[in-house]
Amino acid sequence: MKLLRLFPLELGRLLHSRMTWLIVLLTVISPAVGLVLMYLANPALAGGAAGGILFGLLTVYELDRAGRSRVEVLTNAVVSPLAAALVRLPALLAAAGLALVLTMLVWLPISCGLIGSIFDGGDYVLAYLLFMGLALPLSILAAAAAYQYTRRADLPLVLFAAFAALSLTVWADNWQLCWLNPCVWALSDDFSNFRILRSAAYMRLTWLLGLAGLWALSYLCIRRYGRGPLGSLARTARRVYRPLLAAALLLCCGWSCAAQPFIDHSNPDLSAMTFLTMEPLEGVACLRRSAQVTPDTRRGTVAGTASYQLQNTTGQEQTVALGVTPGYTISNVRANGVEVPFSVSDYQEYNEAKLEVAIPAEEQVELTLEYGGFPQESMPTMQGSKELSGEYLCLENAALSPRLMNVMPGEDGYPATIEITLPVAMTVIPFGASEAEVVAEHGDGTKTWRYETNRAGGILYAGDYVREEIQAGGLTIDFYYGRKHQAVMEAAGAAEAVRAVVDYCAGHYGPLSFGGGERLKLIQSRVTGGGYAVDGASLLDEADFTAHNLGDAGKGGGAAEVMIHELVHQWWGLGNMFDDSGPDSPWSAEGLTCYTTYRIVKELYGGDYAREHYVDQWRGEVEDYYLNFYVRRPEYLEALPEAERLAISNSLSGMRQYSEMPLKILKAEELVGGEAAMDEILHGLFNRELDPMYPYLTYQEFLDACGLTEEDLTLD
């Protein structure tokens, strides 16, 4: 009861301190760092890092107040130092809560304005609570524990600074150790973020247990009766529940860290190919397979049943290997209705573990199994690819159903029937030429979709999508994008941009290798950091269609032209990949993409418009580049700190790719005889026979096709 009476007094004293309000004010404005700093390119992340450091400093400042004023003996005579510690901690936490609430209120209208029509209040609240809100108590606990161990101001500040610096530097790529700045590389605007938010929450709560345990241990070391830390520990620990509580918190932290369900234990050596080079079984073939998949979109888990029709002509028992996504459990494995032994390896590679099943010597074997669980990811720094919610999901290969590793296909390949049951608002999109159809509707608000495919694995997307059917370039294009992004897409003229790009590029360069059929799917994915393609489908990254990207003047004169730019990458960048010529070369997919965008815009809006918004802009930026101080005096660039040097180098490199290279291609166009000649050259490069060992388009290949040298393309 005494503690309850002391708490409002301590909180009132804290809120009457000018230092407290200065820290609160700085915390409220700290998210602005995220608008200008690429390292923490999110206001909530920046606010958490900066606010955490600020409240760590405030904690040491407040705990040292009595010692700094030389009244510690008097205050300890009035209030036990143990009681004072139990009152000061919640008072500091309450001040941190006040700072968080004020920050969220101040940044709510700012975030609404910056994000626009796709602003999601739920994501906003969760992002600030997890990225910023939980950083403040962690910092307070860490700083308070350091002070209670040392009972002086200077050493705790050094320890806390080192602890924060470790999180921001050495531990930055370790999602479980970066306690101050969660390892969050991007949040989706159009789809859900449950997976990455759960991961951040898990990390924060794990650290909360650990730092609470350290604080409880430091609480035992608070100086009493003139004793040192060990003597005080022995005295305070007489009440057994105190050390037991500290030990329990630390043990729970260790267990939580070891039992994390998000990241697998795949071999970090990306050149490892143990599973890929597995010898196929002689005399065993897969005639057909099927899977019935039922994701739980609320829990983010998957449950399914897989069946494989195998032909075993060896007359002997065989061991079939299948790839299983880590996080899944396997059960009820049967061959022709009889349970058979199986095992799952501890070794993992490329987000797969090996399931081995013994099948009988019978010629026709129906292998069935049940699988399910929370699918784990293999890339801790880019979590979110296995998002599974009522708004979006992506199940790839073994995450969709266990993948045969050492069984060859039959005469008809790997014919497969996949069924998946999802909420009615979700549209199922097989990544490929297959088309899904609804085969059943259920009373619980779900539908069952079915599609046929012919692969050992496969990728399936599903979400709250809008589908537009577009006729262009002799193809029927099914353009899928998130419903939340519909207004942005319509304002940017997405359908018209798709039509213009496909008509132009297919007519001038040739059809896409992965669009050789009558239909092509263009699918907007959740933010992934890039795209890829297979026969009949191509992926478009959500990041290409954000309001910020569509307003990038370096890619076009308006949102519609930036949309054209991003779609041209289906030809230059995805249909034809480019080599990395190094930091000193402007050669990349962006050069030909900008040039092609210019040509399309020239056809649509005329030469004067294209010259003003593209060529003149490129020339102006190139002139500024050659006048840049660090370009003229590179020795000064080398003298800068690494972070500053990289920021400047990346900026200059981007200018060369987006402006200098298009001008070089434009000059090459003049030297080879005009637009028609350049179109013929690019058509030949696009349709050249690829070297499977190095399928990249190089700058030298471009120069050779034009009959030019690098010196010929030197800009005046």
Residue ranges and their predicted role:
Residues 43-71, 99, 306, 369:
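Long, hydrophobic alpha-helical segments
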Residues 177-203, 230-301:
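N-terminal, polar/Ser/Thr-rich
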Residues 317-319, 327-387, 440-448:
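A surface-exposed beta-strand-loop module
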Residues 348-350, 418, 471-581, 585, ...:
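Juxtacatalytic substrate-recognition/specificity segment
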Residues 370-462:
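Extended, low-hydrophobicity, Ser/Thr/Pro/Gly-biased non-transmembrane segments
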Residues 410-412, 548-627:
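Zinc-dependent metallopeptidase catalytic helix centered on the HExxH motif
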Residues 504, 644-716:
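Amphipathic alpha-helical substructures
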Residues 590-663, 671, 692:
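Acidic/His/Gly-enriched intrinsically disordered linker/tail segments
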